[in-house]
């Protein structure tokens, strides 16, 4: 049926219903436009949000088009018309009125399309006229341009009048565009249709409606077909291998295979293949050296940057600016022999009494104190123990100090620890001040002490040297002002400066564990400013500074150079003498701590004593002559524990091996008791005690726990234990001599030598040595000793007796017998 045949037999009637397309897909809500290719007049099908009504409106676009645009719009029109047909076919509401309405709409648009050919000539003519007008317009003034606008609107009106829908204007008597829009909205509508509940459409329906229908077959694609198409596209994307990226790989001295693969963004399997090519079998969890890792990375096309493991400590290196330097207080270390008055001198200087609280009158660990003297000038003192066991702690004290004061008792003179203190001070290269103490005592000789100092190259200023020798009395506070003046004078000559800016750094003086407070570490700040909340690394320990306390027990928030403080927050107990630094974050601190722990472990393995071949054979046979004394050492501070361990390991013994199973800071715990029970060890506690649970476990397991408060008592007891484990010395003790005068042969007994005791005493069972012509021909034991017919235990000098030897009868008259006993003596270390 043609376009004219459908319209002419009957006129369109006006009705109350509106033209509607009952499409089931909501995503096409909005306006769909169909463009007449001849006149570019738009016919819009407007669909409400419910998808139930469609209205037609005609809008005039423009008055000049080129032929290319006309052809393109014809194709667009045909494609959209095809979509509408599909929508009608897909809908399950096959209402005849709906199909009829759609046919009417299509016929109207087809009528417009049929007149395209008749207007082509007219369009070409209009294009030529437009070009001529464009040339004329460029030559006219702005006023002439304004006159062109009504002409343009007039042409648009002419275009509208001559549009393909001119038949509709004639049929319905419409004179203007407004009336045409109104007529279409009110008259060209479909009858009302009772709609069912809209069905929820599927993705497949949407693809089918919007799919290309160039073939015109109208075939509906199934959901499985769509899925297959999607999977095919995905496979194409996967098959396209991404371009390989070559990176710069940072390789440390040792790296794991998996870590190397991650650094290169390569598969672990590829890295393992490269290792196999090099003849190395390794899995992802194993480590390889830097050279091998470099070969693998180079073979895979990456560039390599070698770094050393020690580079993690580079963040700790920083230089102070000259303009930031400020004068700081001197750090003075007090050294000397036991009980020569070091702590008493500090008491006098800082007006406190620490010596009274110390066991045995000696300092058990390093203490750091800050003393303010005249003119508000401060001096930091470090009190090192005077006992010989703390030589290592003293050496650490000398490394952090600016000035060393060596205290010598005027009535005692130079002693062993005094010489060690002099040597430590010389090795540190720091100035020395000699304080001759106890000058208040009677019958002292200061000149004798000075002469003893000359022997060790300590020459006073009065003798032309550079060492200040000051006689003092700490008890009577004599000449203390002169000592302070000497300290400040040397400090001024040294021009001691440090920067209070930047990250803090310094040295650990002492550390311990206290119940309820955790790890307590005494540190000395050497540069920068330490604040609460800073993250520090000290040796292999690290943590966040939670609290700072000064030497007077007051809580402070920051510490500047030359200020000693006690901090809380480290995860472990550091060693006395370890350096500390402030780092940016906890990760940096952890990396540095792990690196230092690995170094310490490697060093410990490298210095471990090697067993000789003979010892290995003896151990394998179970006849080892080397005995072991296992010990567990617990102390109050790390420095004391370290000093005890060092002193005990220096005890000389080739037959007893002292093995320290565990040493640490803090009270004795149940785990210590369990370890001691498993290894038959002795637990030694220095200024610490065992808890209730540990004591109960020790009594049950019969573990020996010993407490000490003075270090040399501990060392003496361990030495005695080791001495008791040594094999005793067996020595011959001569007790008498016998002269053989007559030989008797007795049946069932053998030869009996009638003898005379010429010297000492002889005992039954004693050792004998038979001499003939002063040559020893037999050595054995005395089997029989008789006097007349009676068996006796001993015969003294001047008496006769009968003797017989065990398993030996070659005796003659005139032989001499020496009698001796074997005596065991306990050995000492």
Swiss-Prot record:
Residues 140-152 have a biased composition (Polar residues). GO terms for cellular component: cytoplasm. Residues 327-497 form the tr-type G domain. Residues 437-440 are annotated as: G4. Residues 336-343 are annotated as: G1. Signal peptide: none annotated. Residues 383-386 are annotated as: G3. Residues 128-157 are annotated as: Disordered. GO terms for molecular function: GTP binding; GTPase activity; guanosine tetraphosphate binding; translation initiation factor activity. Keywords: Cytoplasm, GTP-binding, Initiation factor, Nucleotide-binding, Protein biosynthesis. Residues 128-137 have a biased composition (Basic and acidic residues). Residues 361-365 are annotated as: G2. GTP binds at residues 336-343, 383-387, 437-440. Residues 473-475 are annotated as: G5. It is found in: Cytoplasm. One of the essential components for the initiation of protein synthesis. Protects formylmethionyl-tRNA from spontaneous hydrolysis and promotes its binding to the 30S ribosomal subunits. Also involved in the hydrolysis of GTP during the formation of the 70S ribosomal complex. PANTHER family: TR-TYPE G DOMAIN-CONTAINING PROTEIN (PTHR43381:SF5), TRANSLATION INITIATION FACTOR IF-2-RELATED (PTHR43381). Belongs to the TRAFAC class translation factor GTPase superfamily. Classic translation factor GTPase family. IF-2 subfamily. This is Translation initiation factor IF-2. It comes from Rickettsia felis (strain ATCC VR-1525 / URRWXCal2).
């Amino acid at each position: 049926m043609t376009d004219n045949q459908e319209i002419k037999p009957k006129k369109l009637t006006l009705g109350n219903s509106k033209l509607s397309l009952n499409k089931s897909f909501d995503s096409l809500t909005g306006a769909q436009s169909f463009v007449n290719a001849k006149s570019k007049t738009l016919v819009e099908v407007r669909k409400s949000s419910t998808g139930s009504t469609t209205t037609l409106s005609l809008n005039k676009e423009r008055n000049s088009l080129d032929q290319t645009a006309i052809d393109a719009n014809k194709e667009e029109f045909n494609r959209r018309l095809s979509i509408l047909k599909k929508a009608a076919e897909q809908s399950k509401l096959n209402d005849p009125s709906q199909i009829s309405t759609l046919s009417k709409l299509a016929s109207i648009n087809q009528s417009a399309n049929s007149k395209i050919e008749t207007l082509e000539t007219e369009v070409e003519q209009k294009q030529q006229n437009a070009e001529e007008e464009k040339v004329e317009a460029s030559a006219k003034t702005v006023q002439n341009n304004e006159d062109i606008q009504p002409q343009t609107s007039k042409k648009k009106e002419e275009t509208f009048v001559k549009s393909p829908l001119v038949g509709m204007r004639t049929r319905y008597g419409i004179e203007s565009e407004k009336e045409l829009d109104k007529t279409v909205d009110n008259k060209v509508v479909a009858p009302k249709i009772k709609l069912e509940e809209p069905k929820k459409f599927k993705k497949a329906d949407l693809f089918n409606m919007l799919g290309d229908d160039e073939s015109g077959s109208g075939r509906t694609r199934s959901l499985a077909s769509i899925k297959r198409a999607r999977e095919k596209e995905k496979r194409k994307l996967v098959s396209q291998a991404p371009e390989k990226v070559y990176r710069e790989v940072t390789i440390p001295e040792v790296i794991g295979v998996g870590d190397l693969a991650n650094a290169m963004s390569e598969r672990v399997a590829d890295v393992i293949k490269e290792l196999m090519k090099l003849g190395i079998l390794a899995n992802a969890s194993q480590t390889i050296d830097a050279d091998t890792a470099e070969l693998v990375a180079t073979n895979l096309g990456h560039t390599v940057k070698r770094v050393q493991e020690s580079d993690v400590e580079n963040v700790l290196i920083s230089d102070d600016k000259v303009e930031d330097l400020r004068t700081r207080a001197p750090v003075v270390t007090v050294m000397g022999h036991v009980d020569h008055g070091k702590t008493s001198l500090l008491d006098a200087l800082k007006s406190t009494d620490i010596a009274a609280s110390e066991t045995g009158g000696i300092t058990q660990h390093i203490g750091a104190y800050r003393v303010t003297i005249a003119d508000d000038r401060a001096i930091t003192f470090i009190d090192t123990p005077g006992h010989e066991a703390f030589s290592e702690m003293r050496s650490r004290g000398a490394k952090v100090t600016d000035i060393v004061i060596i205290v010598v008792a005027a009535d005692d003179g130079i002693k062993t620890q005094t010489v060690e203190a002099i040597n430590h001070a010389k090795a540190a290269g720091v100035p020395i001040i000699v304080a001759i103490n106890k000058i208040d005592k009677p019958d002292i000789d200061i000149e004798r002490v000075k002469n003893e100092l000359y022997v060790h190259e300590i020459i006073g200023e009065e003798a032309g040297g550079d060492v200040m020798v000051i006689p003092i009395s700490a008890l009577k506070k004599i000449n203390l002002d002169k000592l302070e003046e000497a300290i400040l004078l040397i400090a001024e000559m040294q021009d001691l400066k440090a920067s209070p800016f930047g990250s803090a750094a310094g040295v650990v003086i002492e550390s311990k564990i206290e119940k309820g407070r955790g790890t307590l570490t005494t540190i000395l700040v050497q540069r920068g400013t330490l604040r609460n909340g800073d993250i520090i690394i000290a040796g292999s320990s690290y943590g966040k500074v939670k609290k700072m306390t000064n030497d007077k027990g007051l809580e402070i928030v920051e510490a500047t150079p030359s200020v000693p403080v006690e901090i809380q927050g480290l995860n472990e107990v550091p060693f006395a003498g370890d350096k500390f630094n402030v780092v940016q974050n906890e990760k940096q601190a952890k990396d540095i701590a792990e690196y230092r722990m690995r170094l310490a472990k490697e060093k410990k393995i490298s210095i471990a004593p090697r067993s000789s071949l003979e010892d290995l054979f003896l151990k394998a046979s179970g006849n080892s002559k080397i005995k072991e004394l296992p010990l567990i050492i617990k102390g109050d501070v790390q420095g004391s524990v370290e000093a005890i361990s060092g002193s005990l390991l220096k005890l000389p013994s080739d037959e007893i091996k002292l093995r320290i199973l565990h040493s640490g800071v803090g009270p004795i715990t149940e785990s210590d008791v369990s370890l001691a029970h498993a290894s038959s060890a002795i637990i030694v506690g220095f200024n610490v005690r065992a808890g209730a649970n540990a004591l109960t476990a020790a009594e049950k397991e019969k573990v020996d726990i010993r407490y000490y408060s003075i270090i040399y008592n501990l060392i003496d007891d361990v030495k005695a234990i080791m001495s008791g484990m040594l094999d005793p010395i067996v020595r011959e003790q001569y007790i008498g001599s016998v002269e053989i005068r007559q030989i008797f042969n007795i049946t069932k007994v053998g030869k009996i030598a009638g003898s005379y005791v010429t010297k000492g005493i002889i005992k039954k069972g004693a050792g004998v040595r038979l001499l003939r012509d002063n040559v020893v021909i037999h050595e054995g034991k005395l089997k029989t000793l008789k006097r007349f017919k009676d068996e006796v235990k001993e015969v003294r000098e001047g008496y006769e007796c009968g003797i017989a030897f065990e398993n030996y009868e070659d005796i003659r008259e005139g032989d001499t017998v020496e009698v001796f006993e074997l005596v065991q003596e306990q050995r000492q270390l």
